[in-house]
């Protein structure tokens, strides 16, 4: 986009930011000829420069598993609300069905549920821990690693959503995406989790 607008100051091209969520018939870019008309050769150069500048990716169907861990302080209504919120969030990505699981907030219990999801051919595993992830030796990261999983990143420089864990599990010829969900993902408001999910469901992450 910078290169397009560097061709001439007689035309301005603006668009939504990269990786924005878009819907059918939504305007994603606008073009303005500043003096209302420009030289044809300049226009051709702008068009040539704009090749492959904009791409729209469809959401892909994926088998999603939602695992929630609980401890003695976990309220049943919190678990129920998390399921409802997550289903609505995923519905915006074209996912109409998810597999739900609940277990104790212990490495052995959570590891077992993750392994079960792997065996059930999950494409994406979302884990809401009973407590926030403190470090790589916490319950959720340890449970991921016990299933031969790899931590890609712990923490994200965005608020809300900074206490997120991104990982992957290699199973046969398939890579399973894994997200240790931050507390903000229990809220329906758009946050950093949405930006990650959009990329995963479009095959970009």
Residue ranges of predicted features:
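Alpha-helix initiation/capping motif
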Residues: 1, 9, 38-39, 75, ...
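Phosphate-interaction motifs
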Residues: 1-44
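Glycine-rich, flexible loop/turn motifs
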Residues: 18, 55, 152-154
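Short low-complexity stretches enriched in small and charged residues
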Residues: 19-26, 80-83, 134-136
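Phosphate-binding glycine-rich loops and their immediate beta-loop-alpha structural context
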Residues: 29, 35-124
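Short glycine/threonine-rich loop/turn motifs
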Residues: 71, 81, 98-205
């Amino acid at each position: 986009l910078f290169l397009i607008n560097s061709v001439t100051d007689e035309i301005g091209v603006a668009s939504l930011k990269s990786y924005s969520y878009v819907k059918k018939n939504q305007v994603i870019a606008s073009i303005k000829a500043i003096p209302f008309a420009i030289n044809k050769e300049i226009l051709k150069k702008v068009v040539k420069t704009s090749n492959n500048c904009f791409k729209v990716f469809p959401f892909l169907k994926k088998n999603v598993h939602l695992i929630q861990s609980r401890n003695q302080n976990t309220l049943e209504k919190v678990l129920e609300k998390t399921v409802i919120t997550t289903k609505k969030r995923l519905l915006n990505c074209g996912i109409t069905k998810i597999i739900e699981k609940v277990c104790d907030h212990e490495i052995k219990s959570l590891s077992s549920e993750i392994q079960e999801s792997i065996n059930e051919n999950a494409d994406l595993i979302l884990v809401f821990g009973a407590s926030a992830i403190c470090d790589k030796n916490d319950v959720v990261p340890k449970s991921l690693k016990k299933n031969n999983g790899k931590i890609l990143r712990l923490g994200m420089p965005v608020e809300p959503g900074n206490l997120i864990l991104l990982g992957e599990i290699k199973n046969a010829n398939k890579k399973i995406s894994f997200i240790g969900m931050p507390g903000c993902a229990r809220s329906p408001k758009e946050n950093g989790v949405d930006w990650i999910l959009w990329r995963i469901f479009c095959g970009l992450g």
